[in-house]
């Protein structure tokens, strides 16, 4: 038989183990409780987060709705403004269209009115023409009837109040001054062709190679190298000696000028002024149609009598700004300055003729303008000629010497004063002042010498005249003494 099993009872744990198991159980429960609390907190937090997210979404939706509403209102405002602008633009277009239609209607009415007037005028002209033709035909029939009847016939007399009025035009200044105009017959101004004049014009009588080639200067600049001004002037001298005696054979020539302009209407023109119109007419009848240098001369009367107005004064001093395009006369200088009186229009002033004017003009040519000016000033300061003329020239010479000494003293004193003032100045200024003072003193000495020479010559002429008069008196008185 088997031995009976021995019953075993669990051993009672010790107090230490019991307490450890109890603490373990407590920690487990605490962990379970913390897990339950954690699970419940997470769910609450998630719920709070969900509610917060929902609130945010609602707020965003509200904001979006408000923004959508604001944009819609702005769009409505813009649409209203655009509709208003479109309405105003439409009204303006309609108003402009109405105005244009009104203008077109007025223009059409004006055009129709003008067409109607033109038709009426044409009809009236046609009627007048028809009436004139009928009247003319009637007159012709009447004239034919009169001729058939054997009576004399003539053109009808014009009405008493009928006048042919020429359009009033201004005179051409260039033709009046130079006798030629660059427009010729196409000029819009009036050319008064003289029927008689003391001046004869021969167009293009003087020709040279240089004057013929002047038209080619624009296309051939080297053409001017084939001739010179000296050659042209020498040809003018030959021409002058060749033709002037022929003109002088007709009458007295008081002016002879040859134009050296390059303009076609002035090129080579020859101007000859006679003392009388009869001599000029004789020259015209003699030279017109004659041949010279292979060309037939075309002579005509020229209105030029004042050469100061015709001749370009700036060309004589080589300062003419227009050059070859100048419309005033550029003339060759006559040899020995012949006919210089006519250049100054001396023959036109009757009170300035005679030998006295010739002497004064020669003296004016010899003397400079500066000396002439100062001599005129001193002449004004001189006393009257009744008191200045003495029995002999001694007193005048003494007075002139006395004035010369006084002027010399004045100049010496002024020099001393000037030197005393200019000592403290620099050398450049003193040199410039001394040069100016020297030029003034030289001009004064020249005027003084000319005045002395004139006074001495006048005193000598007066003394000679008195001696001659005394001799005449003696010869007249000698028969009486006998």
Curated annotation (Swiss-Prot):
This protein's record includes keyword Ubl conjugation: yes
Listed GO CC annotations: nucleoplasm; spliceosomal complex; U12-type spliceosomal complex; U2AF complex
UniProt zinc finger (C3H1-type) residues: 166-194, 306-333
Biased composition (Basic and acidic residues): 360-375, 383-398, 413-435
Gene Ontology terms for molecular function: identical protein binding; pre-mRNA 3'-splice site binding; zinc ion binding
Region (Disordered): 1-59, 115-135, 351-482
Record protein name field: U2 small nuclear ribonucleoprotein auxiliary factor 35 kDa subunit-related protein 2
Origin species: Homo sapiens
